Amino acid sequence: RVLGYSASKAAMENFTRWMAVEMALKFGDGIRVNAIAPGFFIGKQNKDLLLNQDGSLTERGQKIIRNTPMQRFGEAEELNGPIQFLCSDSASFVTGIVLPVDGGFSAYSGV
């Protein structure tokens, strides 16, 4: 259903890994390359797809929540912690990862 979107996400993940290797080989630990993979966050772009006018979930919104172990959408502020971690000295030996911030959506198999 969303071939272009899926292909672009896969490309970004592979690019992140490739760039991490290239930068580490050229600059050692001076440049780290990581990414975050946000799950479902309600914003202007998707609000009408996920919420009805009265604020209840659309069919698509319900399906997403059913497949998100934390049973909710993310809040934009919840991206701050993972970003700060990846930029901090605590992640000084972390490079080439794509960190999901998705309430467990990517880990859930529906079982």
Task: List each language-model region with its residue ranges.
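Active-site loop-to-helix junction immediately N-terminal to the catalytic Tyr of the SDR YXXXK motif
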Residues: 1-7
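Active-site helix of classical SDR
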Residues: 8, 16
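Alpha-helical segment proximal to the catalytic Tyr-Lys
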Residues: 21-26, 92
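Short, small/polar-rich loop/turn modules that mediate ligand/substrate recognition or access, typified
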Residues: 27, 32, 94-96
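Conserved SDR Rossmann-fold cofactor-binding beta-strand/turn motif
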Residues: 32-42, 87, 100-102
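A glycine/serine/threonine-rich, flexible loop-to-helix segment
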Residues: 40-68, 78, 108-111
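Non-catalytic, hydrophobic alpha-helical segments
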Residues: 79-80, 86
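Short C-terminal tail/terminal secondary-structure segment
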Residues: 83-84, 95-111
